[in-house]
């Protein structure tokens, strides 16, 4: 038994020597933190957030990399746990129906992600994220490869975010609010009883192919004007479908896919995909964007949905500000025998500020013309949030409240119908951990 203990002790003492020898032979280094981690504990003006979940160059977790930096492997973990309270209006129903005003209340876990990201051969980036908290096709949160010819010319294929809306394209966990604007996530209301036709303005994750890149427009300047572009094809069936289910459009005679693109301009250099980061409390970044797309024969081959959006966002020291406006046109396919088309719009503005290195507060005002521009009335949704960062433990605590108001409707029935399925009062407490 004593010999066994002695052998184990010698083996443990020899591990550092063996690791050092292995590093010399293979050129692989193992680090507790990523590149420039010492600086990142204090300040950094820009963090690589290309993988959409966790910044590749921040101080969370560890990285395996070759000496020349051409091979990088970073495993990561990301979790969010929420406590939610939702109060719903009676919607004109008599109390005799004994409906529950409090619903969809309790605890939830929207994300429990394990993933791998990195680079191979200095040109090929990759990312795989498995969300154990999801079901069905959403378990594969994203999975893609990205080949870089140059910074201005890159190809990406797999499951990833469609190029529409600053709110969606922000890195997961880097948003000011725990919940996305309702104007992007709520389904619009159509005056037809078609259960399969419930489009929302937001598009989110999807399977497809994208050509994208960023160019310096004034390369001689230190903080150069930059232009970014993203254009591609996607299934248009959403994040819950990982199979090829599309056909050819009977009306347009083209593949029934989502055709989308986005063009951005950044006057102060590259704009990181964050709405406030406790490691980025200095420097300035700004972005102007224009995006659009058409989803051919979407909603179970029932509609053709066209979307257009404009966006502006800024990081300036401890401040963050953003505003977006978007419009969606829904027309029915010929097989539906519905000649009418409908237009919907939404917009929001939000502002955040770091009062200390750990404490951020924010406000958002969100608008949605949910019943279409042909009817009077819209929804307005003010919201407030407080975020507290425990940087030593990679924790983020968030508390959010949102009110859903109704304004300008022609009658009480339209008023009651416009917020069906949406809570009047919503409160969220969220704990977020990343490694």
PLM regions and their residue ranges:
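Outer-membrane beta-barrel "beta-signal"
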Residues: 258-270, 390, 421-435
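Sec-dependent N-terminal signal peptides
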Residues: 4-13
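C-terminal beta-signal and adjacent terminal beta-strands/loops
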Residues: 390-396, 402-417
């Amino acid at each position: 038994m004593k010999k066994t203990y002695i052998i184990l002790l010698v083996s443990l003492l020899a591990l550092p020597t063996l690791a050092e020898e292995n590093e010399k032979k293979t050129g692989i280094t193992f680090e507790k933190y990523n590149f420039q981690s010492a600086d990142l504990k204090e300040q950094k003006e820009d963090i690589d957030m290309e993988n959409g979940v966790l910044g590749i160059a921040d101080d969370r977790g560890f990285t395996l990399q070759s000496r020349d930096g051409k091979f990088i492997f970073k495993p990561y973990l990301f979790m969010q746990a929420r406590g939610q309270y939702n109060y719903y209006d009676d919607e004109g129903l008599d109390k005799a129906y004994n409906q529950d005003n409090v619903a969809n209340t309790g605890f939830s876990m929207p994300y429990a992600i394990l993933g791998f990201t990195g680079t191979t051969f200095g040109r090929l980036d990759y990312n795989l994220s498995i969300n154990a908290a999801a079901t069905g096709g959403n378990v594969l949160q994203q999975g893609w490869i990205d080949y870089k010819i140059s910074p201005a010319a890159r190809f990406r294929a797999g499951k990833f975010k469609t190029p529409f809306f600053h709110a969606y394209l922000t890195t997961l966990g880097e948003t000011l609010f725990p919940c996305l604007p309702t104007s992007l996530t709520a389904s619009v209301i159509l005056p037809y009883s078609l259960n399969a036709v419930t489009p929302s303005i937001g598009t989110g994750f999807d399977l497809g192919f994208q050509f994208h890149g960023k160019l310096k427009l004034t390369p001689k300047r230190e903080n150069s004007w930059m232009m970014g572009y993203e254009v591609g094809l996607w299934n248009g069936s959403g994040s819950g479908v990982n199979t090829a289910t599309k056909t050819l459009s009977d009306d347009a005679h083209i593949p029934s896919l989502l055709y989308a693109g986005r063009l951005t301009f950044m006057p102060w250099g590259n704009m990181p995909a964050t709405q406030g980061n406790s490691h980025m409390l200095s420097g300035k970044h700004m972005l102007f964007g224009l995006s659009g797309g058409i989803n051919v024969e979407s909603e179970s081959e029932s509609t053709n949905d066209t979307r257009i959006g404009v966006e502006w966002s800024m990081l300036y020291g401890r401040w963050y500000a953003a505003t977006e406006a978007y419009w969606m046109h829904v027309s029915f396919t010929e097989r539906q025998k519905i000649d009418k088309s409908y237009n919907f719009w939404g917009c929001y503005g939000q502002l955040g500020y770091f009062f200390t290195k750990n404490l951020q507060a924010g406000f958002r005002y969100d608008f949605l013309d949910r019943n279409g521009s042909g009817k009077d009335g819209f929804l307005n949704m003010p919201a407030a949030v407080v975020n507290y960062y425990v940087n030593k433990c990679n924790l983020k605590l968030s508390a959010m409240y949102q009110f859903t108001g109704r304004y300008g409707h022609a009658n009480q029935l339209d008023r009651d119908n416009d917020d069906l399925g949406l809570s009047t009062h919503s409160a969220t407490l969220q704990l977020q951990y990343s490694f």
